[in-house]
Design a protein with these regions (language model features):
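A structural "hinge/loop" feature
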Residues: 37-58, 79, 106, 155, ...
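Detector for C-terminal structural segments
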Residues: 200, 210, 298-337, 389-398, ...
Length: 557
């Protein structure tokens, strides 16, 4: 087999790769950073990286090979120092950092990395990110000297994200755990910058303290992190306003007025866009199987109103391609920008003209009648019960569509029932968050358009709930995943974008954001819009694992 080696050169000097503005300056050490998150439940002191509902601060304890910033695609070395694709992109070779110790003083080696992934293979119930799923095409993981080699039986370069962000566990601890899905790991041993100091269940607080064996000299700056969970966004806001928190993760309505404007020099927030909210069509049902009808619906919806009423204009309206803002420069086909701009506009007359072009007209009651003389029925817009933002958007969409003769009602279903309706295809339209997040648009398109994830109505779809498939899109997805050549990958994404804008299998509505609010009364160095070196939240989820860089960079004023 012809051997092609593609290197991603990553400088191992931490002060260069992390890009921390504070490095080399006169930094003030110490202090306890008070972090409050609204998670809707009380603290469950489970420190297992295999917990389906992981604790947010897990990345401060268990490091991954790399930090992959899904906002902008930036990759930062952690336990891995560099990587390269070999053998026609069938092998991923990761160089493992030397001189690292686990928090109990045991040396960390490449064997720990190989063990982490093979442990998932031995225990499929904890393989939450599908490392060994058939669709990953992963064949083996082996440690060789200071490297770990991931071998694939079919090229799948986007899967780097899953491998790079998997928390690495110590073999000398976990090899003795026979039922990992049932173990809550009360005394976690990691390589990260912090260790667990205290757990106070009545106060819903975990206190972390510096790991004395951490490999990065001079980091972290803060001595401790007190992580508290609360039931509601309101409680989190109250703690922030009362100076009982330094960093909060919560949705705060009208954040600019309620928080930032009170003291602009100190009260800060950054809600970076990481995904989108979409209006799903059931494209196997009439009239949503007609792309012109879908285009008319798109023009009939005032997306700016959705953003204003549901999200107070913080996240912005979504790009019609579904690409998030920080990825547009790299992945948006510039020749499609005018079309995307047009499709993002609100134009009720354009919607009416499109409907007329395919034989629809309004009757005396203002309802659309098809060319067959039948009045369109009242359609349902499916939303989860209690999801106030989705409900608000559904109400506006319903009014917008009524203006062009499409009558709808809002169908609120409980979370599990809502998901069942999406997966089985028993809906007309639905508001949902876009499936698939990652450092490029590929992850959205792969989740939404992969035929393997679709199904006929009544059968279970994994993630292609619109049930839209297109052989040209499928081919482009295959081109992207089979190469590490950026130019080829960009062309593949351009192809999908064009089809997306022509067919509109779903409508991107508004951007989804992370929620990070903080006070700079005591601490500074948080990521922000001008320095997006990390997320504005700690994230411990499979596929969305990060925030360690924020924990390393924040310091006393």
């Amino acid at each position: 087999m012809r051997k092609i080696t593609v290197f991603l050169v990553i400088v191992s000097l931490v002060f260069l790769i992390l890009g921390f503005s504070a490095f080399g300056q006169n930094i003030k050490y110490g202090g306890t950073l008070r972090v409050v998150y609204a998670i809707g439940s009380n603290l469950i002191p489970n420190f297992s990286p295999y917990n389906p509902s992981p604790i947010n601060i897990l990345p401060l304890i268990y490091e991954s090979l790399f930090d992959v910033n899904i906002l902008n695609g930036q990759t930062t070395p952690l336990l891995g120092t560099s990587y390269k694709w070999e053998d026609n992109d069938l092998k991923l070779v990761v160089n493992i950092r030397q001189g690292v110790k686990w928090s109990d003083g045991t040396p960390f080696t490449a064997n720990d990395v190989a063990f982490t992934f093979n442990y998932l293979k031995q225990n499929p119930s904890i393989d939450l990110s599908g490392i060994w799923a058939p669709s990953s095409y992963l064949e083996s993981v082996q440690a060789t000297g200071g490297n770990v080699i991931f071998s694939f039986y079919k090229a799948n370069t986007p899967f780097f994200l899953n491998l790079a962000t998997r928390p690495i566990i110590p073999e000398h601890i976990w090899s003795r755990v026979k039922n990992p899905s049932e173990w809550d790991n009360p005394e976690p041993i990691g390589t990260g910058p912090f260790i667990v100091k205290n757990v106070n269940v009545p106060n819903n607080t975990v206190t972390l303290t510096k790991n004395p064996n951490y490999w990065m000299k001079g980091r972290p700056y803060v001595d401790n992190i007190a992580y508290t969970v609360v039931l509601s966004n309101t409680t989190a806001l109250e703690m922030l306003l009362a100076n009982k928190a330094d960093l909060v993760g919560a949705f705060i309505p009208n954040i600019q007025q309620i928080w930032a404007n009170r003291n602009p020099s100190i009260n800060k927030y950054w809600w970076p866009v990481y995904s989108i909210n979409i209006l799903l069509f059931n494209t196997l049902k009439y009239p949503f199987n007609n792309s012109i009808f879908r285009r008319a619906v798109n023009f009939a919806i005032n997306k700016s109103s959705l953003e204003e009423k549901a999200y107070y204009n913080v996240g912005g309206t979504a790009n019609p391609t579904g690409i998030i803002p920080l990825q547009l420069d790299k992945w948006m086909d510039p020749t499609l920008t005018p079309l995307a701009s047009e499709l993002g506009s609100y134009n009720s007359q354009k919607a009416q003209d499109l409907l007329t072009s395919i034989g629809f007209k309004k009757n005396s009651n203002g309802r659309l009648v098809g060319s067959n003389g039948e009045v369109l029925p009242t359609f349902k817009i499916l939303v989860p019960v209690g999801a106030t933002d989705f409900i608000t958007m559904a109400q506006i969409i319903s009014e917008n569509l009524k203006n062009v003769g499409i009558y709808t009602v809002i169908d609120q279903e409980a979370g599990s029932t809502y998901m069942t309706s999406l997966m089985s295809g028993t809906f007309d339209m639905a508001i949902s968050s876009g499936a698939g997040i990652g450092p490029s648009p590929y992850y959205l398109y792969y989740s939404e358009f992969n035929p393997a994830f679709s199904a006929q109505i009544g059968q279970t779809a994994i993630s292609d709930y619109s049930r839209y498939t297109n052989p040209l899109v499928t081919a482009a997805l295959q081109v992207f995943s089979s190469t590490s050549d950026l130019n080829l990958q960009q062309q593949a994404i351009y192809t999908i974008e064009r089809i997306m804008l022509m067919d509109l299998p779903f409508i991107p509505l508004t951007n989804r954001t992370m929620f990070g609010e903080w006070s700079e009364s005591n601490f500074t160095g948080f990521p922000n819009e001008s320095d997006p070196y990390s997320y504005s939240e700690f994230m411990g989820y499979a596929g969305l694992y990060g925030g360690e860089l924020m924990g390393l960079n924040v310091h006393l004023k």
